[in-house]
């Protein structure tokens, strides 16, 4: 009779950097909140390497709900879970609205995405607004007399 082959214990591959206990590993969460969708894009500190990118539209079925706070919250929870798998424990936040010659106000998903990241156990470092501001832009849409309601 042949003996059963026993599996040899494999070394566990740990994703992410090796750190001491109680030390934070930072990533950068770029949150782009327009009025049509909310993007949460986590990179390393240099911004070159994408670790995870999830949008509100990936979490809900209806197009009208892509920019909703609920979709942003679901996306942020997914992002936080993936970050923890990769060993990221803290995030710097870069919040961006559409900007340019369009609105400089972040969309409805911005605040709920930030809250969901904080509530899911991620430590928040710096919060920065990186909305592009025109120095002297092309002409804004709406015509000479502006948008009439």
Swiss-Prot record:
Which one Pfam family would you cite for this protein? Ribosomal_S11
For this chain, the family text in UniProt reads:
Belongs to the universal ribosomal protein uS11 family.
- Gene Ontology process terms (BP): ribosomal small subunit assembly; translation
Q: Which residues lie within the region annotated Disordered?
A: 130-149
**Biased composition, class Basic residues, residue ranges:** 140-149
Origin: domain of life: Eukaryota
Q: Which organism is it from?
A: Zea mays (Maize)
Alphabetized SUPFAM superfamilies for the sequence: Translational machinery components
- InterPro entries recorded for this chain? Ribosomal_uS11, Ribosomal_uS11_CS, Ribosomal_uS11_sf
Matching HAMAP family: Ribosomal_uS11
Keywords (alphabetical) are:
Ribonucleoprotein, Ribosomal protein
PROSITE patterns for the chain: RIBOSOMAL_S11 (PS00054)
Any one GO cellular component localisation term in the record: cytosolic small ribosomal subunit
Q: Which GO terms describe its molecular function?
A: structural constituent of ribosome
Q: What is this protein called?
A: Small ribosomal subunit protein uS11z
Question: Has the keyword Ribosomal protein been applied to this entry?
Answer: yes
């Amino acid at each position: 009779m042949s003996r059963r082959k026993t599996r040899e214990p494999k070394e566990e591959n740990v994703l992410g950097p090796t750190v001491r206990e109680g030390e934070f590993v930072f990533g950068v969460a770029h949150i782009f909140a327009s009025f049509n969708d909310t993007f949460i894009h986590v990179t390393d500190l240099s911004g070159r390497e994408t670790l995870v990118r999830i949008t509100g539209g990936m979490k809900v079925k209806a197009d009208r709900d892509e920019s909703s706070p609920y979709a942003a919250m679901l996306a942020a929870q997914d992002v936080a879970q993936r970050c923890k798998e990769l060993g990221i424990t803290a995030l710097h936040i870069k919040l961006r609205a559409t900007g340019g010659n369009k609105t400089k106000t972040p969309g409805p998903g911005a605040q709920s995405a930030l809250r969901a990241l904080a509530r899911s156990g991620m430590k928040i470092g710096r919060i920065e607004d990186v909305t592009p501001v025109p120095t002297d832009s092309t002409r804004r849409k709406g015509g000479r007399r502006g948008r009439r309601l």
